């Protein structure tokens, strides 16, 4: 019988492959938390949302379902999903505060921002619950989280392209997301090989498509961000010269 993966067990045998997977889980947990805190800071500093409406509402819906409705199926994260729920709630509050600056060109949306965010969050929450009812909470936890990660990475790219500037974004937000995603994928591969946490979903071609796509988005992001920064610099200098004249 395998020894439970406690902190003491990890220190006794730090090179055990499952112990390494636990360390990767901690890296992912801390990384995502830093990502959310970074979004709060950047959104407040730049007075513009740091995350799109779809990934934010999907994340909150997923976290609510598995933190409060099916907590047993996120128990291997030892309460981290609840921490993420509260951190994302802070992201939502700041986003609602600064969203009018980003929705100024959409009068209808500008007038109903709070309703839109609440409605989309409820829809994603209902969808996550329906997915859990359809395929079971164990697989639903993984596949629902996969959708969250896909939206987070893809919408980060889309946000840069649609805005044409880097306000609301930062290397810290990207790095925390990328390292957490990569660590999480390696952890899942290890646990799949050892049949831990019920992860049969990794033998799915769709799962590998999702993994490759998300990693590709995260790998491309810093290059796009850097290109945007280079385009912004001359424009900012020109604006500064005009103000000083």
Curated annotation (Swiss-Prot):
Transmembrane segments: 17-37, 51-71, 76-96, 113-133, 138-158, 170-190, 205-225
Predominant localisation class: membrane
Enzyme Commission code: 4.2.3.-
Alphabetized PANTHER family for the sequence: PTHR42038, TERPENE CYCLASE AUSL
Function of the molecule: Terpene cyclase; part of the gene cluster that mediates the biosynthesis of paraherquonin, a meroterpenoid with a unique, highly congested hexacyclic molecular architecture. The first step of the pathway is the synthesis of 3,5-dimethylorsellinic acid (DMOA) by the polyketide synthase prhL.
Protein name listed in UniProt: Terpene cyclase prhH
Primary gene name: prhH
InterPro entries in the cross-refs: PaxB-like
Membrane-protein topology: Multi-pass membrane protein
GO terms, biological process: terpenoid biosynthetic process
GO molecular function: lyase activity
Cellular compartment(s): Membrane
Keywords attached to this entry: Lyase, Membrane, Transmembrane, Transmembrane helix
Any single GO CC term annotated in Swiss-Prot or TrEMBL for this entry: membrane
């Amino acid at each position: 019988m395998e020894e439970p993966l406690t902190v003491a067990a990890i220190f006794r045998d730090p090179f055990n492959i499952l112990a390494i997977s636990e360390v990767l889980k901690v890296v992912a947990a801390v990384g995502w938390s830093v990502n959310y805190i970074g979004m709060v800071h950047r959104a407040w500093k730049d007075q513009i949302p740091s995350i799109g409406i779809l990934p934010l509402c999907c994340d909150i819906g997923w976290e609510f379902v598995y933190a409060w409705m099916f907590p047993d199926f996120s128990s291997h994260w030892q309460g981290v999903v609840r921490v993420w729920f509260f951190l994302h709630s802070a992201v939502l509050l700041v986003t609602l505060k600064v969203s009018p600056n980003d929705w100024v060109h959409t009068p209808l949306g500008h007038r109903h921002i709070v309703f839109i965010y609440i409605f989309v969050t409820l829809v994603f929450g209902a969808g996550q619950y329906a997915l859990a009812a359809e395929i079971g909470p164990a697989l639903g936890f993984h596949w629902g989280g996969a959708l969250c990660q896909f939206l987070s990475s893809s919408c980060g790219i889309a946000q840069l392209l649609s805005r044409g500037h880097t306000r609301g974004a930062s290397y810290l937000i990207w790095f925390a997301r990328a390292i957490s995603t990569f660590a999480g994928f390696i952890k899942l591969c290890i646990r799949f090989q050892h049949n831990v946490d019920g992860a049969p979903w990794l033998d799915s071609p769709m799962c590998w498509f999702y993994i490759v796509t998300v990693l590709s988005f995260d790998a491309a992001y810093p290059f796009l961000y850097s290109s945007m920064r280079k385009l912004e610099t001359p424009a900012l200098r020109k604006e500064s010269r005009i103000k000083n004249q």
